[in-house]
């Protein structure tokens, strides 16, 4: 599969480069589309899956039986695209439109360094982890701008909540990734996956020695994306839709798309940093060469990565259907008084485990 893609992509890349500056621009646009189109399609089916899963949990007839629950999500898309974008008369017109774009752009840009396989990555940057930290922290600026430009007290309150929440949990996520960097010895995402390779399968993954950091990163990822039970930014019972309260139509859809794209991105990153990425959990247990179509079961590949991502993406929905919303002060207390001290302690523990050879870097 990878060889087939490379045989197609490399000649195509050379052909575009032969066209001069215009070809370079077209190639850049093509790479942007290679990120945007799959993400948009994935979000569409993710919304369908969310409706189905919550429908099963809550025994809702619409998502379960009416048209097999497929048409509701697509009806929402058409409804949002064809609705008028209404702007409050007291809002800042330009900033009101720029805000959703500023939220969506980092959500798409972060995907450029995410590896799907050993060779299937758009940009195998040596500083991929630092780039991800930068991109994932930029989205909050769009939320703050939306709250300010709307000139609404509810929108502004939601934006301020989001700023405090993202800053709080960004620190915990960053400290959790410091442990990953120490254990892998790299900030390249592909090298982080290779550091978890070995003959013991999932026992070589960072999930076991870095389990507290895994929990911190997972929960912080849920808080970072403002999802239940950390959705005080859009608390319907308190501030309606938060920073999006004045948005409608396509502008609201951009916020919606950015949120779900970030949810899927966090699911990918958890799988890459702690669960071996595309590596098989039984890698090294079986060495027999049966057939190319069966070998991926123990040699690894993008299907394994997608299965791990599917689990964490479904967990987002499970949290939404099961847990009540935390109070704002509880969210802040969890981030500052529990997660940050825990990550600092476990960074030291990780350094000791690497020093004494408890954590062995992969092949």
Swiss-Prot record:
It is an enzyme of class 7 (translocase). GO terms for cellular component: plasma membrane. GO terms for molecular function: NADH dehydrogenase activity; oxidoreductase activity, acting on NAD(P)H, quinone or similar compound as acceptor; quinone binding. InterPro entries: NADH_UbQ_OxRdtase_su1/FPO, NADH_UbQ_OxRdtase_su1_CS. The chain crosses the membrane at residues 29-49, 62-82, 96-116, 127-147, 163-183, 202-222, 239-257, 264-286, 299-319, 339-359. It catalyses: a quinone + NADH + 5 H(+)(in) = a quinol + NAD(+) + 4 H(+)(out). GO terms for biological process: aerobic respiration. It is found in: Cell inner membrane. Keywords: Cell inner membrane, Cell membrane, Membrane, NAD, Quinone, Translocase, Transmembrane, Transmembrane helix, Ubiquinone. Its EC number is 7.1.1.-. NDH-1 is composed of 14 different subunits. Subunits NuoA, H, J, K, L, M, N constitute the membrane sector of the complex. This is NADH-quinone oxidoreductase subunit H.
């Amino acid at each position: 599969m990878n060889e087939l893609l490379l045989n197609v992509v490399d000649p195509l890349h050379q052909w575009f480069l032969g066209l001069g500056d215009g070809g370079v621009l077209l190639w850049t646009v093509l790479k942007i589309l290679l990120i945007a189109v799959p993400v948009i399609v994935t979000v569409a089916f993710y919304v369908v899956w969310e409706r189905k899963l919550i429908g099963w949990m809550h025994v809702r007839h619409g998502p379960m039986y009416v048209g097999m629950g497929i048409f509701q999500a697509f009806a929402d898309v058409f409804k949002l695209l064809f609705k008028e974008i209404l702007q409050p008369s007291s809002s800042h017109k330009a900033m009101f439109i720029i805000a959703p774009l500023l939220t969506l752009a980092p959500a798409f840009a972060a995907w450029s360094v995410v590896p799907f396989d050993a060779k299937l990555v758009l940009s195998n940057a040596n500083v991929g982890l630092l780039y991800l930290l930068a991109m994932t922290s930029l989205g909050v600026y769009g939320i703050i701008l939306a709250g300010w430009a709307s000139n609404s007290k509810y929108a502004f309150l939601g934006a301020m909540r989001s700023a405090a929440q993202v800053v709080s949990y960004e620190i915990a996520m960053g400290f959790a990734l410091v442990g990953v960097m120490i254990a892998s010895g790299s900030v390249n995402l592909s090298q982080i996956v290779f550091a978890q390779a070995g003959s013991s399968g999932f026992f070589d993954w960072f999930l076991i020695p870095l389990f507290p950091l895994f929990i911190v990163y997972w929960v912080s990822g849920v808080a970072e994306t403002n999802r239940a039970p950390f959705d005080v930014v859009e608390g319907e019972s308190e501030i309606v839709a938060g920073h999006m309260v004045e948005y409608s139509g396509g502008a609201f859809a951009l916020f919606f798309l950015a949120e779900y794209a970030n949810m899927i991105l966090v699911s990918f990153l958890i799988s890459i940093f702690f669960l071996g990425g595309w590596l098989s959990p039984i890698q090294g247990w079986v060495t027999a060469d049966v057939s190319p179509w069966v070998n991926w079961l123990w040699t690894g590949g993008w299907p394994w990565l997608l299965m791990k991502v599917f689990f964490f993406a479904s967990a987002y929905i499970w949290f939404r259907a099961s847990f009540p919303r935390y109070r704002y002060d509880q969210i802040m207390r969890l981030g500052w008084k529990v997660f940050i001290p825990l990550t600092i302690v476990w960074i030291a523990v990780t350094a000791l485990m690497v020093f004494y050879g408890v954590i062995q870097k992969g092949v």
